């Protein structure tokens, strides 16, 4: 009788498997695999080698606290002649004496998470069990049988592997790209993402069921949407929108997700202060990409927050056009969420592909502050019965806006406002380039098209179907040049009378600082004049906005809302026009000193010219970049920076990965907040 087969050790082939599974950056000390794909391991036996005629090898793979075959969290499989794609299986690749090389495969629908892999070796009546090691299983966008399969290699690299990108802010007329370090492969981030799944209330309530359901990216996307905010659980970020961030970090100051996720883990899963929509979206993007789900951050300009699902945002104003009160139903200057790519077997055919997921806590969905995933195609088609939260997302891009002017007797009159259209310039980063891609067409049919009317009819969007009133008088807000921080500048109310009648009007122009979510701040410029509009004439009325007026009340959004209200007393009519202005921050210049080689020290010199007429105090540069720095670095500049002078600092870098990387920089001081910059750095081999 053959002697017992004893295992000496197991080589999980971490580096080789990491290269094959596009997880090399994660495979420093642990094996990280993508499901549905073959991987290799090598067994070293003591005394004698494996003999197929007398030895039997059976493998076990388990995940979660209470694994079971029924839940899909436990598997037993024997060595076979060939690896079976799409199931737990193993076969021999090669044998040299006591060394056995094996090939194994996981199912394309296996739950993701941490697995323990074991081996039972039996010879006759003798048998021994061995723990071969642990591995982490992720979703696989390269596997056609996986629910997150994406058939474009360029898109897989952008939406799964790329660690830096852009988030779009500013205003619909001045779109601002903000660099962001997603850093999904940075040290400790994968463990933090798995911890996030284990902290979600569904896991704490029923651990076995939650682990089983992690096979579905739909389920995991919904969990991540809830866990990135902390409104119902021990989630990552606490939201705040009142411009008081003294006991935390301003949402505008963040430049990446890595620091946020590390803070959350290091402080015992306590909320990180503070986030706003793009921070929630960026952290969700990091987590979902890390878990293997193709994901991108999306910005919707003029985004509606409709609480009662009537697809209508109503503003009530006094006779001067001023809002009677700030309210929860608002038009946000912009709003960010993420889209993740997956199949939707729970929905009708055609609703697979990009799914909107919104982690910003706005409204509850099934009792939890989360939103989505909802098919972007379903939004475009106006199919509001689609899971999950289709009415809310449809309203974000399609709601109508009505302005009511309250009269002296308390009655209200409807004002005409052609300047505010919800759901414009929906933006995301282009694939493989540092450019913006407009994806509005994926959410909406062209304005005025028969398809648009059909969608509005299906969605019962009666207000959008109503005929628009025409008066023959039009007004829009135009801007001049030099809309930069520290400058005085002019804006103009451009008024056209396209009728044969003379119109006697009163124009009220007002500029106020505004937060990106539509909450107004103090006034920083006004004009009140009487106008005679001649037949078929055009007029342009300027409003001067002074730095001394806006400097003390501008929020970190750098936004000013200009409102024009044209009143025609004889006709008792009101015409409203608005425009949000974004004030450009000064440019951060970045120089890289030294030869950019792997594992060789580099120095980044960052500088900024003070554009203001006042000195700058408390200046600080913060930099980070996946593959360039292990952690975020900050440099304080103690001396005041006189008007027109440069503020400059140097930061040491130690690049560990070859290829293209982005160094992301933030600058803060007493008078300039959240100035962003970046530089692409190509690191060559040592």
From Swiss-Prot:
Main localization (coarse): cytoplasm
Protein name from the UniProt record: Protein-glutamine gamma-glutamyltransferase 2
GO cellular component annotations of the record: chromatin; collagen-containing extracellular matrix; cytoplasm; cytosol; endoplasmic reticulum; extracellular matrix; extracellular region; membrane
Catalytic activity line of the entry: L-glutaminyl-[protein] + L-lysyl-[protein] = [protein]-L-lysyl-N(6)-5-L-glutamyl-[protein] + NH4(+); L-glutaminyl-[protein] + serotonin = 5-serotonyl-L-glutamyl-[protein] + NH4(+); L-glutaminyl-[protein] + dopamine = 5-dopaminyl-L-glutamyl-[protein] + NH4(+); L-glutaminyl-[protein] + histamine = 5-histaminyl-L-glutamyl-[protein] + NH4(+)
Name of encoding gene: Tgm2
Organism: Mus musculus (Mouse)
Disruption phenotype: No visible phenotype in normal conditions. During apoptosis, mice display defective clearance of apoptotic cells in the thymus. Moreover, inflammatory as well as autoimmune reactions develop spontaneously with age. Defective clearance of apoptotic cells is caused by an impaired capacity of macrophages to engulf, but not to bind, apoptotic cells. Mice also show glucose intolerance after intraperitoneal glucose loading: mice manifest a tendency to develop hypoglycemia after administration of exogenous insulin as a consequence of enhanced IRS2 phosphorylation.
Residues of the site described as Important for catalytic activity: 516
One of the record's GO molecular function terms: peptidase activity
